[in-house]
């Protein structure tokens, strides 16, 4: 036991010693570009963060902090200077790209952090690996690709987002196309959502108007649905919609090995077409005027719910190896 404690102590002291010996070297690059209306900014970065800040003039100002870490100051400087940043202006488009020269080092590191001040009407196209992206507001079409990093977006009008092995937190977006895998997704208010999700640990939407999704190995939770939700190929997953607006138009789900929970109440009026193979259909307090049939291992229910004899809204759920809950 004493020998084990001594070994652990020596390892800890070695780790502390190597950390204490690490030196940091920083250098900055600042470039300013004059642009016209609706300029474009395209950035491709890795091993660092991208921050977009809204400015008040017709300029795009790019500030890049390059950081090197090494056992000596000379090593740290050499690692920082082994990062190249190419910034250019072509017409009304600013482009930036970082490249890292290949070097072999021990107990060292490099990073490139961007802070970019842009006009409000800028069109953004951002890509980052091994780092986060921060955007307060995007009034023009936005394209973001982030891998091994997180996206924090406050507000956007139209956005195309690809995220993998990270997280995406989007507070508000009118039209969002989101493709994600092995990530955590948190959405606030979205007008229209389309996309694919696979192996996402968290996928939560506070409020959505219309959504069209394909999902695999992901639990999707929608707190409130206003108009329509179409989920195709819900495989080894789950869908839970907490609250559905009375004036909704459509819910359509094709599921396998997944449970489907829809927050429908006796106050809703809709046409139901439900089929559960190797599963059950649970209607709760709903009064569905329906023909409830069973064929082999398949339960089927077709009919209408609510006061209207010919309701406009439609609920269609086809499931295999999973239950359907309308309550």
PLM regions and their residue ranges:
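Intrinsically disordered, low-complexity terminal regions
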Residues: 1-327
């Amino acid at each position: 036991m004493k020998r084990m404690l001594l070994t652990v102590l020596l390892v800890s002291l070695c780790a502390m010693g190597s950390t204490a010996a690490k030196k940091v070297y920083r250098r900055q690059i600042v470039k300013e570009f004059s642009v016209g209306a609706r300029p474009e900014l395209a950035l491709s970065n890795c091993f660092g963060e991208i921050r977009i800040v809204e400015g008040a003039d017709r300029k795009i100002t790019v500030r890049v902090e390059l950081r090197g870490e090494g056992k000596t100051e000379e090593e740290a400087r050499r690692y920082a200077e082994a990062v190249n940043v190419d910034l250019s202006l072509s017409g009304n488009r600013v482009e930036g790209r970082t490249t890292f020269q290949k070097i072999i080092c021990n107990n060292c590191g490099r990073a490139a952090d961007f802070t970019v001040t842009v006009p409000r009407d800028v069109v953004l196209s951002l890509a980052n690996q091994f780092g986060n992206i921060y955007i307060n507001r995007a009034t023009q079409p936005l394209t973001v690709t982030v891998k091994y990093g997180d996206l924090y977006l406050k507000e956007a009008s139209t956005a195309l987002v690809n995220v993998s092995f990270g997280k995406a937190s989007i507070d508000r977006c009118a039209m969002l196309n989101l493709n994600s895998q092995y990530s955590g997704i948190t959405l606030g208010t979205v007008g229209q959502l389309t996309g694919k999700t696979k192996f996402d640990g968290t996928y939560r939407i506070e409020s959505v108007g219309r959504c069209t999704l394909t999902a695999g190995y992901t639990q999707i939770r929608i707190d409130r649905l206003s108009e329509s939700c179409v989920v195709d190929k819900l495989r080894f997953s789950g869908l839970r919609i907490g609250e559905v607006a009375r004036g909704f138009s459509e819910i359509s789900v094709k599921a396998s090995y997944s449970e489907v929970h829809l927050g429908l109440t006796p106050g809703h009026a809709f046409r139901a077409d439900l089929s559960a193979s190797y599963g059950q259909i649970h209607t709760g307090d709903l009064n569905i005027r329906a023909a409830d049939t069973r064929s082999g291992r398949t339960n089927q229910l077709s009919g209408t719910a609510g006061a209207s004899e010919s309701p406009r809204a439609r609920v269609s759920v086809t499931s295999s190896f999973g239950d359907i809950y309308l309550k």
